[in-house]
UniProtKB/Swiss-Prot annotation:
Belongs to the HAK/KUP transporter (TC 2.A.72) family. GO terms for cellular component: plasma membrane. It is a multi-pass membrane protein. It catalyses: K(+)(in) + H(+)(in) = K(+)(out) + H(+)(out). PANTHER family: K+ POTASSIUM TRANSPORTER (PTHR30540:SF83), OSMOTIC STRESS POTASSIUM TRANSPORTER (PTHR30540). Transport of potassium into the cell. Likely operates as a K(+):H(+) symporter. It is found in: Cell inner membrane. Keywords: Cell inner membrane, Cell membrane, Ion transport, Membrane, Potassium, Potassium transport, Symport, Transmembrane, Transmembrane helix, Transport. This is Probable potassium transport system protein Kup 2.
Amino acid sequence: MMNESSTEKKNELSLSFAALGVVFGDIGTSPLYAFGQVIKYFPINDHNIYGILSLIFWSLIIIVSIKYLVIVFRADNDGEGGIIALAGLIRQKIKKPGGWLLFITLVGIGLIIGDGILTPAISILSAVEGLESLSPNLAKYVLPVTLIILFFLFKMQSIGTGKIGIYFAPVMLIWFITIGVLGFLQIIQNPKVLMAINPYYAIYFFMIHKYFALFILGGVFLVMTGGEALFADLGHFGKKAIRTGWFAVALPALLLCYFGQGAFVLMHIEYIKYPFFSLSPDWFLPVMIILATIATIIASQAIISAAFSILKQASLLNLIPRLKIIYTSKFEKGEVYLPLINFILALGTCSLVVIFKSSSNLADAYGIAVNLDMLITTVLVGIIAYYCWNWHAFKVMIFPLILVIELAFFAGNIPKLLTGGWIPILIAFLGFVVMYTWHCGFEKLRELHHRDALMDAFIIDELNQNKISRQSGMGLYIIDPYDCEGESLLHHLRLNRIFFENMIFVSIKIENKPYIPIEDKFELIKKAEGFYLIFIHYGFTENINLPNELDEMFKRVYLPFEIIKNKLIYFIEIVFVEMTRERQKHMYMWQKHLFSLMIRNAVPDIQFYRLPYNKTIAIGTYYQL
């Protein structure tokens, strides 16, 4: 028993260590720009610095430590976190939640795309700006160096991070130790800053500055950016590992660093442009700049990987068009590369760097997307607490209280809309338009399909009565997502009168759970003699490889005929959309054009399901929108 307990502790510690290189990268590099962004609006004096530090301290405690690590962590979907996991959890309990859940989910995914564009830009730019602390003459190199780093960062996505990923955790541990020590060295010179732990100073700050103090919350919020990643990465490391990493390493280091910056600016009012790099002795500054740059690259890698992961899940759930998914690791199933998304993120990130030119300017655009994502998380977890956990209404009242705090931060972020905050909102809006148009287009395809498929029921009767001649062999038909039970392919068979002696229709069902156990994966329905419908159930985080899945299926599902894999022929459907001027419900003409463009360029079934090219036949189906 002692050995087992010791082994478990070692595993937890190793997971906590690994989490440092992924989970805490974003929030761990916030000290580069967050504190400097806040203090530029106020005169440097004891009351202002103590008030700002008190707001930072209690924000990290209430929102990140209590809300996320204590409350939100309870809302895991079979160990998985993130907005899609939360939405899936609600759908398991509320079978028909209505359009509001779809709306929130699509907005949340759009915000994650915006975050994936903004985070690499502000993080790496803020690190490279350390060159100015070395010499003002180096300022002209900040932009080109940042762009070069970003170019190689996005270029390396196609080969994955498997080989260098093992170094992420050690680097981030060194980073946290370094910023913690540098902050501590300043605190011991001015220990009075520790009085800011008292919430009185945060309250007094509001009493002095009144409504203007609300504006400063937009800057204070920057210390929490990356906090949402703690929940999003839950499936990779687990609750205990992330909690241990946060409370043992990340949180103490961050607080020491922020309080150290506060102590420093009170003693050196003239060094307020880059208070973070001012903590470093001159002899250590070049090392600090290199370490900060590497840390921000790791933080950026984490958010890019998270964007790939969430959009892969959205693609499986048919919330967005099917994307080309490349698996970059044979061992880590979660490591994926999405070429189109990588190009969009790279283009957006580099454009923002060129347009805004400094991390201070970019900070105005940053934060709003994360703030909205946190608000959405609070709402969804509140619903889960009431409907899934059966919390009493009195206990659920904690969520409105958290919402009030987060809405106060959002109010502080609103003025940023005029100076760049509109960018993540625009990105999220464009993402929402694309996803909602895809949803509406598919709903229309389902409607048109069911209208035409009503007559196909008699084919089943004819097959049962042996009124239709059959040819020898077997065909395996892959059903498209808009088609529930393969009526569209049956319609094709009825037209050309080609019926195999044995036919298997395979329908892929993506469930509201991250993983489906193998014993629940397959469902067999006999439709007619020699004609079977098989449902294969996947979780929204699983990788789809249909030929491999079929091997397992044939072992577990009894069929009254022999399956010869080498002679198996796959049939897939390719949908073509012809636009008409007829006004469709919930779809304007521009949406028809957009949907037609997306369905033409979506990854075909043969790639998505990884079917063999030399044994796959495509059948075209036409619809008029």
